[in-house]
């Protein structure tokens, strides 16, 4: 309502981009990982159709929960590898050229949190300074999440343009 934010009275918000940072639960089983690439493509089409924005910029943060040290790759043929491949494949869809950007998140890892994690229970006071969760949530590392957010923001700015 205009009464809640008077400075924005009459302003119509615009959705300028869409950010996808999901995929962990999709790596399990056989069906979801195998269908991830096709599903990702359908998601982009559906979001754009539903929002009436045929070229809406889309940024995808590829699953990276396997890559604590920043250099690891998911096990070949694993559900994780299939999900990540499906996410990154959106960079190569001709109709998405210049409007979709997917990037890997494992290289952005927090190496300090990764080094402490194996002994987090014994060194809890040290651990809670750098992490707050298990590996499937990027170690709960604010550094890792902020790097992902920065990379996503930079990718979106490139897609949206000046």
Say what each PLM segment does.
Residues 1-162:
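Cell-envelope and extracellular/periplasmic
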């Amino acid at each position: 309502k205009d009464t809640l934010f008077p400075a924005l009275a009459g302003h119509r918000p615009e959705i300028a981009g869409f950010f996808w940072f999901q995929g962990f639960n999709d790596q399990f089983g056989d069906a979801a990982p195998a269908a991830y690439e096709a599903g990702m493509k359908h998601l982009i089409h559906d979001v754009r159709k539903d929002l009436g924005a045929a070229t809406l910029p889309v940024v995808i943060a590829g699953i990276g929960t396997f890559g604590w040290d920043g250099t690891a790759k998911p096990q070949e043929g694993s559900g994780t590898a299939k999900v990540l491949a499906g996410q990154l494949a959106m960079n190569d869809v001709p109709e998405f050229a210049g409007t979709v950007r997917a990037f890997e998140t494992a290289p952005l890892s927090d190496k300090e949190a990764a080094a402490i994690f194996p002994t987090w229970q014994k060194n809890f006071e040290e651990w809670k300074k750098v992490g707050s969760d298990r590996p499937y949530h990027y170690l709960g590392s604010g550094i890792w999440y902020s790097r992902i957010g920065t990379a996503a923001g930079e990718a979106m700015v490139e897609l949206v343009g000046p």
